[in-house]
Amino acid sequence: QEIIKGHVTLGSLRVRQDYLLAEGLLAPYAEDGSVPEAMLDFALARIRQLAAHELGHTLGLEHNFAASADGRASVMDYPHPYVILDAAGEPDLSQAYTTGLGEWDKRAILLGYQHFPDGVDAAAAREQIVRDTYAAGLHYVADVHSRGDAFAVSAGPAHPLGSLWDNGSDP
């Protein structure tokens, strides 16, 4: 039996910061003083994504900075908000942050927590999970290959799929 405990604190300044990002994108300076609901939705979507990210750490998941190149396949990436322009040329924040776990997250949890019955070669079964994950087109780029490592010799952010704060498949 395994007991997992994680303690994560997400301060209100994070929500405020994302609210201000939305304000900068939307410039909602209407004469009547109204504020678009999209600003709060944007900020709350980010805090939900961040909460899932931090919970992932409590489960043992590391950052995966290639997930943004794989269609937002993991909450363990550092996502830049995905903002598009609507038909009128106005910023649309409705898809800024994804909801739920990504495919990479599900595969990583399967790898780390799958119980194999007696008689099954667990090492071979885990290797097959990894092979199937990569065969599905998912990638993994760790911290050391995205931003370097203070404790190892590293080329730093040299991997084309491992940029922090990006979004999309074009490295």
Give short role names for the model-derived ranges:
Residues 55-70:
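Catalytic Zn2+-binding segment of zinc metalloproteases
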Residues 14, 18, 66-69, 73:
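Alpha-helix termini
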Residues 70-171:
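Conserved catalytic/binding loops enriched for acidic/polar residues
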Residues 2, 6, 63, 73-74:
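Flexible, active-site-adjacent loop/turn segments at secondary-structure boundaries
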Residues 15, 60, 116-119:
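Aromatic-residue detector
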Residues 1-58, 83-85:
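Metzincin-family zinc-dependent endopeptidase catalytic domain
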Residues 9-11, 48, 64, 167-171:
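Poly-acidic low-complexity segments
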